[in-house]
A protein has these predicted regions:
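A conserved mid-protein helix/loop that constitutes part of the nucleotide-sugar donor-binding site
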Residues: 23-28, 204, 208-227, 244-250
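N-terminal strand-loop element at the rim of the active site
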Residues: 2-8, 12-20, 24-79, 170, ...
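Short hydrophobic beta-strand element within catalytic cores of glycosyltransferases
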Residues: 44, 294, 303-307, 312
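Aromatic "clamp/platform" in nucleotide-sugar-dependent glycosyltransferases that forms part
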Residues: 267, 286
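A short helix/loop element that forms part of the nucleotide-sugar donor recognition site in Leloir-type
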Residues: 184-199
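A short, active-site helix/loop in glycosyltransferases that binds the activated sugar's phosphate group
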Residues: 145-185
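Short His-centered aromatic/hydrophobic patch
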Residues: 96-104, 120
Length: 372
């Protein structure tokens, strides 16, 4: 392996740089890698300054803004990649966390000798049938183009790349690792956050962390909570995150008369404190790759009631159950009502795959191996 005198730069490609799932995973690794050896730059497909931009710059990274790909702007989009890599062709690798356009920029990267990595974060596609069809065609080409393939779970890998790639030598699991020590339950933080939210000690606080969007299915959770509240008045529902369905979800809360019972925090940078404040974590997603928030909730000692659509690979301890959304609202109300409550202070869940300190070192070694 060549001796390193300056950090080698890896170009991270994402849809945007808000605090979403894929972005959180990337930033966790970024913080814990040795940035004297590996440094990240970012492509963001947004026309505004991103939420994470200042943080990235403070860590030594650079952010470049590209137009969002719309099919009709294919020539313009491809030209921007050609011009960009013509002037920035010293990257060790391009790590595509937004693989829908990877078939466009991977051949350009190879022209300049840049290694390419395709990374899957989900086990389902969104969008209309035309968009999904175009993405499938794009992914088909990526399967033959990329030098390496990663996914957050086996299920996401098979969905995005197919069995032949997942069972081949170029594929690996890139765990959605976190700082385990950060998510350990804190009685002090619990009291602080509950005081801030005006939640009393004897009130049950049900929590959910995730983008306010269709896949996360918070609308179903609100309807479940509405029915649950009839059996246990005084309970509260805490929704941490923002997203494109925020207004619609808030309208549902008002329609059901839950304005004083459902708490919206928006995006926060101290999720771990809010997890300590919760009593129970409920996650009724329609689909996921491997949700970081469920890993975090388990590490915080919360009992988790999770949709059966979520891969079982997310289980890192015994305090989680997987339930079918088709069982309906009453079934989920019953599961919440019968969820076990236990002391969280002495819980000590350890899982080396999800320990960011270990995972970041492995990622660093992988990137550096591309030098040989």
């Amino acid at each position: 392996m060549a001796e390193i005198t300056n950090p080698r730069r890896v170009l991270i490609v994402l849809g945007g740089l808000d605090r979403g799932g894929a972005q959180s995973v990337v930033m966790n690794y970024y913080h814990f890698m040795d940035r004297t050896k590996i440094q990240f730059d970012f492509i963001s497909h947004s026309n505004k300054k991103d939420e994470l931009e200042d943080e990235i710059v403070s860590l030594g990274g650079r952010v470049f803004h590209f137009p969002r790909f719309k099919v009709y702007n294919l020539i313009e989009y491809r030209r921007q990649w050609i011009d960009f890599l013509k002037n920035h062709h010293d990257y060790l690798a391009i790590h595509a966390h937004m693989s829908s356009t990877a078939s466009i920029f991977i051949p350009i990267a190879h022209k300049y000798g840049i290694k390419t990595i395709a990374h899957a974060h989900t086990s389902h596609d969104m969008g209309n049938i035309i968009k999904r069809s175009l993405e499938k065609i794009s992914f088909h080409f990526v399967d033959y183009m990329a030098d390496c393939f990663f996914a957050c779970s086996q299920e996401a890998g098979i969905f995005r790349f197919g069995h032949s790639v997942v069972e081949g030598p170029k594929f690996g699991i890139w765990y959605n690792a976190i700082d385990l020590s950060l998510y350990k339950f804190s009685a002090i933080k619990r009291e602080q956050i509950r005081t801030k939210l005006n939640v009393k000690n004897d009130e049950l606080l049900i929590g959910n962390v995730g983008r306010l969007s269709y896949p996360k299915n918070q609308s179903f959770l609100i309807q479940v909570f509405y029915s649950f509240l009839k059996t246990r008045p005084g309970s509260k529902l805490l929704l941490v995150g923002n997203g494109e369905m925020e207004l619609e979800i808030k309208a549902l809360v008002e329609k059901l008369g839950l304005g004083k019972d459902v708490i919206f925090t928006g995006s926060v940078n101290n999720v771990q404190d809010y997890l300590s404040a919760m009593d129970l974590f409920v996650f009724p997603s329609y689909w996921e790759g491997l949700p970081v928030s469920v890993i975090e909730a388990q590490m915080a000692g919360l009992y988790c009631i999770v949709s059966s659509n979520v891969t079982r690979e997310v289980r890192i301890g015994p305090n989680i159950e997987f339930d079918d959304l088709n069982r309906g609202i009453d079934f989920w109300v019953n599961r919440i009502a019968n969820a076990p409550m236990y002391p969280r202070e002495k819980m000590n869940i350890q899982n080396e795959n999800y320990d960011i300190k270990e995972a970041a070192q492995k990622a660093e070694k992988f990137y550096l191996s591309l030098l040989s």
